[in-house]
């Protein structure tokens, strides 16, 4: 998540630098920036922050150029600004869809983790016990169902942990992040990440 996210920001900044010189190669950097931001989101939905930062920068740039080009009636330059908006929509969608399809291709066997999915979804998994009368889900149906289930699971989680931090405490590093623990009868060892 962190690697993909910061790589996307780095590539976006490189794109901005090339784009100021009107270099067409900047679009390749923008595309890779969006791909890596989507990879960060694919790892964990909090990675959406990286895509959000890039999106806000692109939208602000688009609005600035839209106002300038609308007054001057330079349609050619408006088309390039509009292309960035299309890239902002389609590259993340196609990347995220591809990552989920890869995920579903790797995890193709039935097990205890799929009990919360529909029988049509489970029917697509190897080793399922679903009857013959159930029609298997298509890839797009599985994609939609998986994302709805992930969202519902996260939205309805009410449990807390005594060491949990509030969202506004994250940038301030008020509480450490617990990475690893090992103990035996006489000793215990822990690894925490504590900010500066």
Q: Where are the predicted features?
A:
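Hydrophobic alpha-helical membrane-interfacial segments at the cytosolic entry of transmembrane helices
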Residues: 31, 35-36, 51-54, 69-103, ...
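Alpha-helical membrane-inserting segments
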Residues: 12, 56-60, 64, 94-102, ...
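Membrane-interface transmembrane helices that cradle and orient dolichyl/undecaprenyl
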Residues: 8-29, 40, 58-69
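Transmembrane helix irregularities
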Residues: 38-44
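Membrane-interface anchor segments at the N-terminal boundary of transmembrane helices
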Residues: 165, 177-196
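Aromatic-rich transmembrane-lumenal/periplasmic boundary elements in polytopic membrane proteins
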Residues: 96-173
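Transmembrane-embedded, aromatic-rich helix segments that form part
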Residues: 2-3, 31-32, 46-64
């Amino acid at each position: 998540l962190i690697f993909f996210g910061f790589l996307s920001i780095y590539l976006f900044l490189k794109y901005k630098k090339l784009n100021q010189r009107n270099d067409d190669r900047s679009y390749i950097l923008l595309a890779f920036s969006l791909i890596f931001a989507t990879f960060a989101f694919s790892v964990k939905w909090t990675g959406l922050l990286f895509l959000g930062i890039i999106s806000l920068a692109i939208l602000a740039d688009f609005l600035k150029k839209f106002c300038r080009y609308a007054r001057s009636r330079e349609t050619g330059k408006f088309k390039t600004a509009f292309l960035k908006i299309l890239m902002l929509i389609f590259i993340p969608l196609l990347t995220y869809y591809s990552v989920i399809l890869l995920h579903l291709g790797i995890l193709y066997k039935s097990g205890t983790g799929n009990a919360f999915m529909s029988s049509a979804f489970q029917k697509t998994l190897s080793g399922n016990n679903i009857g013959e009368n159930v029609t298997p889900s298509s890839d797009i149906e599985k994609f939609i169902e998986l994302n709805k289930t992930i969202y519902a699971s996260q939205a309805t989680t009410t449990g807390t942990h005594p060491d949990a931090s509030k969202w506004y405490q994250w940038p301030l590093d008020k509480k450490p992040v617990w990475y690893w623990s090992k103990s035996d009868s006489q000793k215990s060892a822990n690894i925490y990440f504590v900010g500066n």
